[in-house]
Amino acid sequence: MLLDTHRRIVCRALAVALISSCVVLLTACRTDRRIVLTASVAASLTDAIQAAEAAYTQAHPEVEFRNNFGGSGALAQQIEHGAPADIFLSAAAGPMNQLDDKGLLVPGSRRDLLRNSLVLIAPLQSTLSGFDQLAGPAVRTIAIGDPGPVPAGLYAQQSLTAIGLYNTLHPKFVFAESVRQVLAFVETGNADAGLVYATDAASSGKVRVVATAPALTHDPIVYPAAALRTGAHPAAASDFVAWLASPAARSLFTQRGFTMAAQ
């Protein structure tokens, strides 16, 4: 009787140990299959890309995303100097061309993904009614992105130059590190006006669109995307970039005010 009891206890202990070992092995296998994609993303894509990533991971649960948001020019510089990244989504062709010229893109992965427009915004209570009023005394500060690293700032510079206001308004400029910072300056009243993308303005309930910059006054606002050769998972990154042009992703972008670039 005692021997049988002892045997049963030993068998149960062995069974528990075996099950525990299997659980550990299965967990380890799942962990080994996990793919972490690091994406360097233009700040104006913050909301849209997070929605796209959430949709993608539903169909690809093994994939996890880590995002680095900022001005496209600054992100390109970081990547060029060795910052870890699998994917780059830029708000202008220039920063992407910079990496392409260095041979840092996965061949065939680059695509023009989205389009946007540039708008003049002001706080809700502002009486500003057009670009022509920016030079008046009621407007003391105007937020724009730094034209060097921030594509929205370059587009703003081009547009204001084309309509003959850039040099006149220069003393009023507050330069921001990203288009989202421009939006924040206007939202908080730290700037009387600002130039941002239409999608950024639409995401805020604290500003209003005063006017849209004429499209011919600045370069076309196109968002290219590409997988990076220096990333840890170039194949998975290329798959995600291709998926961003799919009908499922397209609806997520258009819901947020973007238009799709012609493929």
What are these regions (language model features)?
Residues C29-H60, E64-F69, G73, Q77-H81, ...:
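Exported/periplasmic ABC-transporter solute-binding proteins
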Residues L2-A15, S21-A28:
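Twin-arginine (Tat) signal peptide motif
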